[in-house]
C-alpha cells in the first residue's frame, strides 16, 4: 500500500523546488471566506519551515496544534499492535492538514510527524483557535466541522485498509 501511495503522490506532486507555498485563502478549508477573516486567522497562526527528515512532533508531545501544509510532504509514523517499531500510516501534502486529533481532544500525540520533503506550514494552536472562535464563530464552527469530517474519512479509509490486511 505504501509503495502505491508513493507512486501516486509522485505522479501528481510537482518537484519540490517547483512547488509554491499556498496562501491561507488558497486552502480548501478557507476558500470563500472574507479577506478580513482570513487576515485575522493568519495573524493568529505561526509559520514554520521544516527541513526534510526533521520531526514536526513526536509520540507523547503535549502540544495542541493543527498543522496546515503550505508546501511539501509530511509522513505520519506510528507503532502498530503494541510494537515499538514505527510504521508509515499516511502521507499528507500541499493543502492538507495533520495533527487534528491532539488539537481536538487535547491529549498527547500518538504518532510521529516527519517532514518527507522540505515543508512550509501554518500552525494554529488551540489557544489561538479559542480566541479566534470568540470573534469568528462561523469560521470556527466550519473549521471544526471540516476537521471532524476529514478525520472521519481518514478513519474509515484506515479501517478499510486494516480489513484488507486481515484477509
Predicted segments, located by residue:
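Cyclic nucleotide-binding regulatory module and flanking cytosolic helices
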Residues: 3-55, 103, 164
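Glycine- and acidic-residue-biased ligand/ion/polar-headgroup-sensing regions
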Residues: 53, 64-81, 93-96
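Residues located in well-ordered beta-strands
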Residues: 55, 73-75, 112, 120
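Short phosphate-coordinating micro-motif centered on Lys-Gly-acidic
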Residues: 56-61
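Short alpha-helix capping/helix-loop boundary micro-motifs
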Residues: 62, 84-85
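Cyclic-nucleotide recognition modules
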Residues: 87-145
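Polybasic "coupling" helices that flank or enter modular domains
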Residues: 145-167
Amino acid at each position: 500500500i505504501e509503495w502505491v501511495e508513493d507512486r501516486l503522490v509522485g505522479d501528481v506532486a510537482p518537484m519540490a523546488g517547483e512547488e509554491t507555498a499556498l496562501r491561507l485563502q488558497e486552502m480548501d478549508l478557507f476558500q470563500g471566506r472574507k479577506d478580513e477573516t482570513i487576515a485575522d486567522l493568519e495573524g493568529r497562526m505561526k509559520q514554520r519551515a521544516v527541513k526534510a527528515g526533521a520531526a514536526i512532533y513526536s509520540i507523547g508531545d503535549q502540544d495542541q496544534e493543527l498543522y496546515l501544509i503550505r508546501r511539501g510532504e509530511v509522513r505520519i509514523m506510528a507503532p502498530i499492535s503494541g510494537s515499538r517499531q514505527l510504521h508509515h500510516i499516511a502521507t499528507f501534502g500541499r493543502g492538507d492538514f495533520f495533527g487534528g486529533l491532539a488539537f481536538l481532544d487535547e491529549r498527547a500525540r500518538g504518532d510521529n510527524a516527519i517532514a518527507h520533503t522540505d515543508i512550509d506550514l501554518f500552525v494554529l494552536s488551540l489557544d489561538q483557535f479559542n480566541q479566534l472562535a470568540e470573534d469568528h464563530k462561523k469560521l470556527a464552527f466550519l473549521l471544526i466541522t471540516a476537521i471532524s469530517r476529514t478525520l472521519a474519512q481518514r478513519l474509515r479509509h484506515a479501517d478499510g485498509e486494516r480489513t484488507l490486511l486481515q484477509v
